[in-house]
């Protein structure tokens, strides 16, 4: 399968999309740089602000409109607004943060060798042409601030 990856939001989303790219490549999928060439588009969404929520919906709709690809949505918008995200892309194409690691298994294994098991940290050098890698230090939050969606979208830290 040819898969295009995009994200809205923070550096954590960027780190996760790069890890997702590595996981998909390990399963024999092809990551493409042109969404028009993709069979699937995966969007890692954000909802930390109302604008981020709107941007997430806008990006998803644009790919639905402008490509022939199936659009999968994951990330904070999907976690915080599960029903709306499922209505936007379909329930089977909507993955909350808790289910994000299951996305690569959704695709059949392609022509990839079985991965070797190395016992060291492999930096996620994704398709974003960055010279730096990200290491996830924390995810989520243990507080219950009334004005913040982080706990809902990301869960406990």
Give residue ranges: language-model regions.
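Proteins enriched for Cys/Gly/acidic motifs involved in redox and nucleic-acid/cofactor modification
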Residues: 1-157
């Amino acid at each position: 399968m040819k898969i295009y990856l995009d994200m809205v939001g923070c550096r954590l989303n960027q780190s996760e999309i790069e890890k997702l790219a590595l996981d998909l490549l390990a399963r024999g999928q092809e990551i493409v740089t042109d969404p028009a060439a993709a069979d699937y588009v995966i969007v890692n969404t954000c909802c930390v602000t109302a604008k981020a929520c709107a941007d997430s919906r806008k990006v998803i709709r644009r790919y639905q409109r402008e490509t022939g690809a199936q659009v999968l949505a994951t990330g904070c918008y999907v976690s915080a607004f599960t029903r709306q995200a499922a209505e936007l892309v379909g329930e089977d194409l909507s993955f909350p943060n808790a289910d994000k690691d299951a996305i690569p298994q959704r695709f059949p294994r392609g022509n990839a060798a079985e991965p070797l098991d190395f016992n060291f940290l492999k930096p996620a050098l994704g398709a974003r042409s960055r010279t730096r890698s990200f290491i996830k230090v924390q995810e989520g939050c243990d507080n219950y601030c009334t004005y913040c969606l982080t706990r809902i979208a990301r869960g406990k830290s």
